[in-house]
Amino acid sequence: ITHELRTPLTAITGYTELLRKECNSGNNGQYIQNILQSSDRMRDMLNTLLDFFRLDNGKEQPRLSPCRISAITHTLETEFMPVAVNKGLSLSVKTGHDAIVLTDKERIIQIGNNLLSNAVKFTEEGGVSLITEYDNGVLTLVVEDTGTGMTEEEQKQAFGAFERLSNAAAKEGFGLGLAIMRNIVSMLGGTIRLDSKKGKGSRFTVEISMQEAEEQLGYTSNTP
């Protein structure tokens, strides 16, 4: 079904791109650009939906490989620093004990990406912080913001697959993002905790057990 859904969308995008190259004058060019942007958004939504169902059905398995925790933190900082600055927010990044661990790097980055994206999205003043710490075989990743925060009821709904926040300022809600992240954390054998207060911001804490790669694969602390 993945192939059946993606093929026609790929065709629409492809033919529209060809049309854009041949007809790029006046309003026609803008109309075609709008079609391309809408197709891109639809593709992203489709990929997100398919990702959710794969994880929810237990069909996705971790792809473990050695990676340095600070490399994950650096990737997230590089991506979100300009996003925060452009919105007038501060982004604080702190990395505790660094280590080379055996984990699914792309999924860990996806978790951090989702948390930071929501934190920036729902914060209008103040800032966002990212903290990573590795201790006793457990990676702790914390994202905290000074944003709108959530009521107790909204916190209960936050990880639901199709729940939306009722706050008008957050009318786009979390969508499937947090539901997917919850499933990713579960797939990796971890836990996620939400602490929030309306008008005071939110704090997400993810804890995932993982072994140091050097214990199994002979990596040293100087391995890139």
What is each stretch, according to the model?
Residues 53-64:
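Helix-loop junction within the histidine kinase core
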Residues 63-68, 85, 90-99:
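Conserved catalytic submotifs in the C-terminal HATPase_c
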Residues 189-190:
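Conserved glycine-rich
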